């Protein structure tokens, strides 16, 4: 069975627009909720949220490829590129993707072109410049294949167009993106445009390495471009949580030009990501309210533990904080941990579940769990 780029109608993707209409409506509504919530935050809080969002997007898009970055170094590097105070140096991998994240969220009106993609690739591959051809499309004569398994039982998941076709293929994709922009002659809704662009880019697989991360960067860039402001969408996190399904959806779409199934999957994942962004903003407001009510009555250990729980975000510590966790965070004794935690419950900062050694403590704010969007 041929790959989609070998079909006569390539690269003319088709999809069932009426089936995608509900998803576009849901996403536009969700994006509006997020944008409205961001607009009502204090500037410093909004800036912190944006930094955290870019940090998590960088961590997640890298984790999809099996690359683990240093969280603190990455956050510090993002702050530095935004002109904010930074308290530590970053390695080349963290520094490069940090600069890429800032570029994605601060130049949304600029059309994508070859040079922009080359610049992104150089940033992304900063730590591997001595081993890879960076900032240019691949040129090797060998087939570009995505494979798995040992040599004697290798499975080819995808084979991309030959290297000598890549520049022309990318020129067609970039021209399509310009035509389908909000102010272009053939504008497309945000999800259809970003979803097709991601699929099309991955089918070309134009770089020697880093195609998945660049492809997901394109998604973020196009969504920001569609709405004219950062949305903290965090699509990479949604893809990471459904990593196997993400790869299956891309692999299935690589055999056909009807992209309906791919777009429906992509839309559901992107809407889920937007809902998590709303949850994140609500968490920030909830924790601010909680702190205002108890801050003056906390000792330094209690404050340290609460701040650690806040730092973990709305999805961590869902199983609850244990006394052992508290001791590890604060370096205190068992008796002191028990007393501190009991006081936090009385103050209304924490809720306790279970009893004895099974006691678990939760922040006294709404626990929100976002389920995958069903379209």
Model-derived regions, located:
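FIC/Doc superfamily catalytic core
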Residues: 1-375
């Amino acid at each position: 069975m041929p790959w989609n780029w070998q079909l006569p109608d390539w690269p003319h993707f088709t999809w069932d627009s009426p089936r995608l209409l509900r998803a576009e409506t849901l996403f536009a509504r969700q994006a509006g909720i997020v944008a409205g919530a961001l607009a009502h935050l204090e500037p410093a809080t909004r800036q912190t949220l944006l930094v955290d969002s870019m940090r998590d997007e960088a961590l997640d898009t890298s984790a999809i490829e099996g690359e683990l970055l240093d969280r603190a170094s990455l956050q510090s590097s993002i702050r530095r590129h935004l002109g904010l105070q930074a308290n530590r140096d970053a390695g080349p991998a963290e520094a490069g993707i940090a600069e890429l994240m800032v570029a994605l969220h601060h130049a949304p009106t600029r059309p994508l072109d070859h040079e922009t993609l080359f610049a992104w690739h150089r940033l992304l591959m900063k730590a591997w410049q001595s081993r890879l051809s960076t900032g240019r499309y691949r040129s090797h004569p060998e087939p570009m294949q995505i494979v798995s398994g040992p040599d004697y039982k290798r499975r080819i998941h995808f084979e991309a167009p030959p290297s000598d076709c890549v520049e022309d293929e990318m020129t067609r994709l970039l021209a399509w993106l310009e035509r389908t922009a909000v102010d272009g002659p053939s504008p497309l809704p945000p999800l259809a445009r970003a979803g097709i662009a991601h699929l099309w880019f991955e089918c070309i697989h134009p770089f020697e390495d880093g195609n998945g991360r660049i492809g997901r960067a394109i998604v973020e860039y196009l969504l920001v471009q569609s709405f004219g402001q950062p949305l903290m969408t965090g699509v990479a996190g949604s893809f990471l949580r459904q990593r196997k399904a993400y790869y299956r959806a891309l692999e299935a779409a690589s055999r056909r030009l009807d992209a309906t199934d791919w777009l429906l999957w992509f839309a559901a994942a992107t809407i889920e990501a937007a809902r998590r962004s709303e949850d994140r903003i609500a968490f920030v407001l909830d924790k601010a309210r909680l702190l205002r009510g108890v801050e003056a009555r906390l000792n330094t250990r209690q404050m340290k533990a609460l701040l650690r729980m806040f730092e973990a975000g709305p999805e961590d510590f869902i199983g609850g904080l244990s006394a052992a966790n508290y001791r590890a965070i604060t370096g205190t004794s068992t008796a002191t941990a028990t007393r501190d935690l009991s006081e936090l419950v009385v103050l209304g900062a924490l809720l306790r579940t279970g009893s004895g050694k099974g006691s678990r403590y939760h922040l006294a704010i709404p626990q929100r769990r976002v389920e995958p969007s069903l379209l």
